[in-house]
């Protein structure tokens, strides 16, 4: 199809995701702001194929990864929020995400920085 994957960052509910599935077979990623352990359960209940766990503030800061301790995360999850080449290894090893989402952590002056991106890829390949 024309859409390969759908990533939702709004207030979409389970009914919205169900209706979206009727229109496309593309995998759905639902992003969530993680402030409490209950936030993890709420996003999982929406029925997306993947969940993206994020600080959600756009500040380049990580959320408290200890909120994931003991959490039963059923869907494969993406880890986002404040990840940089310098903290990527520790974050990935501690929470074991399916995937990582990098943005401002690989930028210099709000532009993607080739060297930072290459360093992040090197770190991931070493895991």
Predicted feature descriptions by range:
Residues 89-97:
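Short glycine/proline-rich, acidic loop/turn segments that cap or connect secondary-structure elements
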Residues 78-80, 99-103:
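Conserved active-site loop/cleft motifs that coordinate metal ions or position small ligands
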Residues 19, 68, 72, 92, ...:
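C-terminal helical cap(s) of enzyme catalytic domains, especially alpha/beta-barrels
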Residues 1-89:
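Conserved anion-binding
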């Amino acid at each position: 199809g024309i859409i390969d994957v759908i990533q939702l960052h709004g207030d979409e509910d389970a009914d919205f995701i169900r209706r979206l599935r009727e229109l496309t077979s593309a995998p759905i990623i639902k992003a969530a702001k993680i402030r409490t352990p209950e936030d993890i359960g709420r996003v999982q209940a929406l029925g997306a194929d993947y969940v993206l766990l994020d600080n959600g503030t756009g500040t380049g800061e990580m959320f408290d990864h200890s909120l994931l301790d003991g959490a039963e995360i059923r869907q494969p999850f993406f880890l986002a929020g404040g990840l940089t080449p310098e903290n990527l290894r520790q974050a990935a090893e501690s929470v074991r995400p399916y995937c990582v989402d990098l943005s401002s952590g690989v930028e210099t002056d709000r532009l993607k920085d080739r060297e930072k991106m290459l360093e992040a890829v090197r770190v991931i390949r070493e895991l």
